[in-house]
């Protein structure tokens, strides 16, 4: 299959079409190979898991409290401290298009605009929740826990706790003969995986930038680096 156009296209449309083609039948394995090649060559690309790998790993997190947090990282691309700050009221699960409101914690205001007495207002962003199973999981969790709208969902003091959950899940996977090329698997792995999953499914980079809370598009563009490795398959170029 030729992923590259014979007519004029923008760079973004090429990335979108190319990435979608990689996830079609027979190309999921190619996506895996590209990722593994980038890791082996120690390229400056975000390390991510593919959807089947994440769903496999989630099976080793049976605790519902832990599972809902990890699934939230995967389904929203939230930074760990953004996820830990979430309340029940931040989720809008009964809408025609379910979504969650995240408070962006990474962006910083210019020093000139910060004063001693100024109340820091965290910018908010909306992230669509595409997976119906995740939406149903959160609905069931909220019904079970009977949380108030302003109650923190995961009152965890340190993200080290979450790292320990993930470490335990990976160890359980290894006991069952399953290993992952990405190591260590951290909270940030799910953020990278979320971004790559959206790119593979053709979501525009500008939308992904908004979902991730990136101020600069260059921060999002880093996720397209992996596709440079695939160019050699589609151009017959000789230097002889």
Labelled PLM ranges:
Residues 86-137:
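Conserved tyrosine-mediated DNA breakage-rejoining catalytic core shared by Y-recombinases
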Residues 5-11, 31, 225-240:
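DNA/chromatin major-groove-contacting recognition/catalytic segments
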Residues 108, 212, 216-237:
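Catalytic-site neighborhood detector that most strongly recognizes the C-terminal catalytic loop/helix
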Residues 159-160, 180-201:
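Short basic/aromatic active-site micro-motif
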Residues 51-80:
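Basic, Lys/Arg- and aromatic-enriched nucleic-acid-binding interface segment
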Residues 130-181:
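Active-site/catalytic core of tyrosine-dependent DNA strand-transfer enzymes
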Residues 30-55, 110-132, 147-149:
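DNA breakage-rejoining catalytic core of tyrosine-based enzymes
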Residues 91-93, 184, 203-224:
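Short, polar N-cap/turn motifs at the start of nucleic acid-interacting alpha helices
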């Amino acid at each position: 299959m030729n992923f590259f156009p014979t007519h004029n296209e923008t760079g973004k449309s090429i990335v979108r079409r190319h990435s979608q083609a990689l996830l079609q039948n027979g190309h999921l394995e190619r996506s895996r190979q590209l990722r593994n090649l980038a890791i082996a060559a120690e390229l400056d690309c975000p390390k991510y898991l593919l959807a089947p790998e994440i769903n496999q790993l989630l099976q080793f997190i049976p605790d519902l409290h832990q599972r809902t947090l990890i699934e939230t990282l995967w389904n929203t691309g939230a930074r760990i401290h953004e996820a830990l700050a979430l309340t029940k009221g931040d989720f809008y699960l009964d809408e025609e298009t379910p979504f969650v409101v995240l408070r962006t914690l990474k962006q910083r205001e210019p020093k000139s605009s910060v004063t001693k007495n100024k109340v820091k207002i965290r910018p908010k962003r909306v992230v669509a929740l595409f997976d119906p199973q995740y939406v149903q999981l959160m609905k069931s969790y909220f019904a079970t826990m009977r949380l108030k709208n302003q109650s923190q969902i995961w009152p965890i003091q340190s993200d080290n706790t979450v790292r320990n959950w993930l470490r335990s899940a990976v160890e359980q996977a290894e006991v069952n003969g399953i290993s992952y090329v990405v190591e260590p698997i951290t909270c940030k792995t799910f953020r990278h995986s979320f971004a790559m999953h959206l790119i593979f499914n053709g979501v525009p980079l500008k939308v992904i930038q908004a979902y991730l809370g990136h101020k600069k598009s260059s921060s999002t563009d880093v996720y397209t680096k992996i596709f440079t490795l695939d160019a050699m398959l589609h151009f017959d170029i000789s230097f002889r």
